Amino acid sequence: PCFTLPG
């Protein structure tokens, strides 16, 4: 669910 992390 983040732009910088997978999710």
UniProtKB/Swiss-Prot annotation:
Tissue expression per record: Expressed by the venom gland.
Species this chain originates from: Tityus obscurus (Amazonian scorpion)
Protein name: Cryptide Pep-23
Subcellular localization: Secreted
GO cellular component: extracellular region
Keywords recorded for this protein, A-Z: Secreted
